């Protein structure tokens, strides 16, 4: 006997696999990828995911990066095995902050982080940067990240960044 939850999970995995293929094909037009992913989500019973995608993907800049962020959301969403959980844009940005930290831990490619920070500057307001600073400022091994971050011209966070170095 297959319970309803198992069917939903199987359907979700199929959707996620198709979605991941979609984000890997970078040559596809924006107007094709987004509606396709949302349509797949709706038809596979992932209504909340579809609504979440619609909300996240309304930011038309950096669409490939946002699609990858959305894939993280979906991956985490599916791992909960429940439909009672839904990510907000705030949760997405926290997840992405964690992704940056993981990337830093794995290969130490600071240039990658700088590049992503630059591309995602529209997401920085009061969310990503303070969160990352808070995570990193307590770890002496990561302190040099601030020296790199300070080279980027983010005037609205310069005071906050500077204050971290004042003891």
Curated annotation (Swiss-Prot):
It comes from Mesostigma viride (Green alga). It comes from the Eukaryota. It is found in: Plastid, Chloroplast. Keywords: Chloroplast, Plastid. This is Uncharacterized 19.8 kDa protein in petA-petL intergenic region. One of its GO terms (cellular component) is chloroplast.
